[in-house]
């Protein structure tokens, strides 16, 4: 069952590189900030995207969320991206893990569903909901 919205992030693509021209396969890195369960966070994420059919991408990524000076959580994710006139719209899932005892401790073993977009200017936005 889809639960409450957990996060809202905004950021910018900070780097891209071609991993393979057969396919092709692209790696994208994003720096973002926002709110996760009421806590202000900074996020660094990297994902690899490959085309699966005309106008559709398959992406796999990983990231780190930081809150305060030392509170951290890591995640992996997988999503399907579809090209639009404004960029690429992603839908997928994120899987968290952390040994944090701080504000991010409640993310441990949480699965989230995501809606994200990277526009043609490299702006990134994401909303996530807990999947219970």
Features from the language model and the residues they span:
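Beta-strand-enriched cores of mature, soluble protein domains
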Residues: 1-132
């Amino acid at each position: 069952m889809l639960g409450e919205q957990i996060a809202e992030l905004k950021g910018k693509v900070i780097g891209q590189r071609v991993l393979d021209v057969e396919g092709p396969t692209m790696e994208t890195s994003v720096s973002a900030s926002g709110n996760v369960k009421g806590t202000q966070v900074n996020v660094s994420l990297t994902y690899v995207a490959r085309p699966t059919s005309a106008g559709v991408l398959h992406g796999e990524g990983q990231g780190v969320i930081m809150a305060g000076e030392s509170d951290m959580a890591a995640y992996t994710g997988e999503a399907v991206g579809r090209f639009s006139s404004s960029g690429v719209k992603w839908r997928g899932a994120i899987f968290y893990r952390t040994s944090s005892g701080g504000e991010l401790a409640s993310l441990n073993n949480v699965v989230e569903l995501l809606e994200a977009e990277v526009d043609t200017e490299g702006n990134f936005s994401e909303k996530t909901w807990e999947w219970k």
